């Protein structure tokens, strides 16, 4: 990034309109009535064209500095780029291309209309930049120029509307809010006594139809996720993988768990982060970066602000440990309804890189072994089992052991790299029983496992073995010719693992204390898993 006096300030992309005016304030304000002007209207096609414009303009050296227009629109983008480069900018709102006439200057400056980029270019490169924009039919307006006075000068024709130091606008003073630990946390970690479940097979099928667990294919199939013919691993399992132009592959996944974050905001946030990393690792990718979207209630409430701060501490702590940088993010406050605030909801997106051939799970065959990596603990707190089956949110939230987390990840990546596994799937929502069922559902083959072989803490109940959502666990599908090599490799790593059983037949069978405690056919499990969410959304 650099800029010289006399360089031109150019706005490219979508037209500026009333949509999105005050959008960031709207996202951080108490909702008392509907405000349509605050809702941005996206256009993915224009966004794609802008990406092409930026890439070509970069290659033609038409860009000295650049900033996307997000929260606050032009008012923030212009002041922030001026402050960061130590320059001044004079701009004219009359030169901004708009969707409609009659927009007031303050509306033009604060509109958050989507798909817009601010570019600083050399005068000599302006015509080249315009030609590139014309090629992709993207609008391009010269709205100002660079000065040396470090001031933001906003004009309408010859009339000065604002003249302020760019630093004053870009570096707003920080607000030191009060925080206090929520009172509800004092008793929520106590596990209430729950009724005995007579039929665990029915319980498993019920959980497979839970909206939080059931397949989301009804949603993502409504958008063509193969545009550009770059999708190598499609959405619906652990993470998606895209082919990049440089021959490498990009793995991407977003995860969140409000129930865990409600019980323990810090550990819940770490768990979301680790789950996203696990999913990326399951595709053979090494996590290289993350983004977050932090959604909370009213930060003026000390208890809500405490949950926000705890979540941030957890995310920061795990990011530093893994050395995975946070490359972007978004915060949305005041998410409340008449019934109260939402649960603390950090969403974590993780990107991973695969340098060579991507890991594509191969077909599961009868006789393939099922191996688990990771330890199951007394951590049913915030589980799908507790909420969906027993209508209870509480108990001991899963805690990430940083050492186990890293060594388990690296071990899985090594197994994939050495082509010793046919597929990898992480254990998360619903616990071991759901992860195992998903392997059978996607492989269209039954399984026969002995849950007594599960690496775990002592004296865990059958329900906790099945449905605890302990972190850092992976299920591996291993060909019989490789099983001894896998066992030798994992034994040397001194991590918790075991061979639980094999794939065979057309039933999901789980043995406990020498008896089959769960038996259900694959076709019924598939119907529950694939059809429930669509039926619910279509028919209520």
What is each residue range found by the language model?
Residues 1-136, 144-151, 155, 170, ...:
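Mobile "lid/hinge" segments at catalytic clefts and subdomain interfaces of large enzymes
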Residues 70-208, 318, 322, 327, ...:
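Glycine-/charge-enriched secondary-structure boundary and capping motifs
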Residues 22-25, 181-423, 428-433, 437-458, ...:
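Non-catalytic terminal/interface segments that mediate subunit docking, oligomerization
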Residues 12, 256, 308, 465-467:
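Bulky hydrophobic/aromatic packing residues
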Residues 5, 173, 235-236:
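Short loop/turn elements that form and flank the Walker-type P-loop nucleotide-binding site
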